[in-house]
A protein has these predicted regions:
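Conserved phosphate/pyrophosphate-binding and hydrolysis machinery centered on Walker-type P-loop NTPases
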Residues: 11, 37, 103-106, 178-182
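Structured loop/turn residues at secondary-structure junctions
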Residues: 20, 101-102, 154, 184
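Canonical P-loop GTPase G-domain recognition
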Residues: 123-128, 133-183
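Conserved G1/Walker A P-loop phosphate-binding module
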Residues: 1-79, 86-90
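Amphipathic alpha-helical transducer elements in NTP-driven molecular machines
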Residues: 79-82, 86-89, 107-111, 124, ...
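Conserved C-terminal guanine-recognition region of P-loop GTPase G domains, centered on the G4
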Residues: 57-61, 82-149
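Conserved RecA-like P-loop NTPase ATPase core
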Residues: 28, 66, 85, 96, ...
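Long, well-ordered amphipathic alpha-helical subdomains in the mid-to-C-terminal portions
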Residues: 170-211
């Protein structure tokens, strides 16, 4: 039995990183993919979208795209660059909303992002929230959005927890179904393993087929 994403994609499953600027999206992308992107602590550190493969499953391809950070009252000179980079997120299977949980204005930042997602007619794309920079928080943190996870992207154990969280969220966007393949259809089997998540692979001797 294997599973297939609800949103069709010829390139496996696509994750799109979004969030208010300086939330730590590029750091998360680097930690998950070793992409080596520019990640200085400043506004608009990412102006060009960057897509890399993230190793969540053995064969199934999952990609992660970083985009320019959202901001209130975006300067006119950056509107075009902002819109063009967000086009990279318009066709993703799952939005990963990164929030700087240590910022006192994090709730306002969340609202800014959600409002812009709605304005761009991307609200139907499933979204999960990653509350980042929890190592900088004093006291208890109360998240506003769910499903969500609280991490510090510079903590190795937290990065592993994030990977496990994303794996479960990817699976949650999929529909299970069963398919039979003849033993001679090795090319088709390889393609399925790359483009879908194979939960189990069995061989039926009587039918001489894989299931």
């Amino acid at each position: 039995e294997r599973s297939r994403e609800k949103r069709k994609s010829s390139n496996g499953f696509q994750l799109g990183l979004i969030g208010y600027t300086n939330a730590g999206k590029s750091t998360i992308l680097n930690q998950l993919t070793q992409a080596g992107t520019y990640q200085m602590d400043q506004l608009f550190a990412t102006l060009d979208p960057l897509t890399r493969q993230v190793d969540l499953f053995p064969n199934f391809e999952v990609t992660l795209t970083d985009t320019v950070g959202f901001i209130q009252e975006l300067p006119t000179t950056l509107i075009h660059a902002f819109e063009s980079t967000l086009e990279e997120s318009a066709d993703v299977d799952l939005l990963v909303h990164v929030v700087d949980a240590s910022n006192a204005q994090f709730s306002l930042h969340e609202k800014t992002v959600i409002d812009l997602v709605n304005d761009l007619e991307m609200q139907e794309i499933p979204m999960v929230t990653v509350y980042n920079k929890t190592d900088l928080i004093e006291g208890e943190f109360q998240p506003n959005l769910y499903p969500s996870i609280q991490i510090s992207a510079v903590n190795e154990a937290d990065v592993e927890r994030l990977k496990a969280f994303l794996k479960e969220q990817v699976k949650a966007q999929m529909t299970y179904y069963e398919e039979w393949l003849d033993v001679t259809q090795t090319k088709e089997l390889n393609q399925l393993q790359q483009r879908t998540l194979v939960e189990s692979l069995n061989y039926d001797e009587e039918k001489n087929q894989y299931c």
